[in-house]
Amino acid sequence: MSAPETTAPLQPPAAQAASLPGSLAESLASSGITELLAQLDRELIGLKPVKARIRDIAALLLVDKLRAARGFSAGAPSLHMCFTGNPGTGKTTVAMRMAQILHQLGYVRRGHLVAVTRDDLVGQYIGHTAPKTKEILKKALGGVLFIDEAYYLYRPENERDYGQEAIEILLQVMENNRDDLVVILAGYKDRMDRFFESNPGMSSRVAHHVDFPDYQLDELRQIADLMLAEMQYRFDDESRAVFADYLARRMAQPHFANARSVRNALDRARLRHASRLLDDAGTVADDRTLTTITASDLLASRVFSKAAPAAQTPAKE
């Protein structure tokens, strides 16, 4: 497999920033946005088109601030978004960073993220949905409302479903409070497309559609290294090769969830690592032993079992 395309750092190089007009360079330096974009670049492997869109939005808001300072006004841009992609591709993480960026650039007051699903918005009885939806919106004002699997709000097969009531309230707030609230709808691309086809009012209010691609094998290996480093673990040479084999097998099986499956696999490897140390009473508990995931901690996975081929039931991580 060829190496994935290298993602350029999100932050403008120092030389580029210095060449900008004085006020723009000063605004860039004082905004703190460079550090936030660099943090996102470190946290997320790959996702080049996603990072490019975030940088574009940050640039628009920064330039709008400069324009406003000089008396130019184009009105607040609509920044409601739709994030599409498979599980584990970083949608929630990007939404969290987006909230911080929007706050840093003065678009929203608080910069917090409120993440919800249908169950948080839609009631089971008459008169129950409106209060639930309005309470969530009240919490989200000044920040970002992230609605995961948003297409479940609309269930046309059930005439008595109250999801449409929640949608109508959302539409009103998205229009009237768009300078103090950003709504991000998330889910699988095909289902979100059908949702927008059935709800043209929602489609017309969402200006930015960002697709999160699945990770490639090498990117998943890098993600695993980052996750282990955060937990103060490491692979040795043998276990790193075994984990690459594990990923190749697991990616071919059902219900693979990108970075989420990587984290699950590492959590189970940590369990096996701990059990292995306790089972060997003579183990010397030095730093290397306590922090190194070995090949045996990975090979115990059912992914390597011939009894569970990829075409049949999904293996445990």
Swiss-Prot record:
This protein's UniProt keywords: ATP-binding, Nucleotide-binding, Plasmid
GO molecular-function term, one example from the UniProt record: ATP hydrolysis activity
Keyword ATP-binding belongs to the record: yes
Residues engaged in binding ATP: G85, N86, P87, G88, T89, G90, K91, T92
InterPro entries: AAA+_ATPase, AAA_lid_6, ATPase_AAA_core, CbxX/CfqX_mono, CbxX/CfxQ, CbxX/CfxQ_RuBisCO_ESX, P-loop_NTPase
Protein's job: Seems to be necessary for the expression of RuBisCO.
Protein family according to the UniProt entry: Belongs to the CbxX/CfxQ family.
Name of this chain's protein: Protein CbxX, plasmid
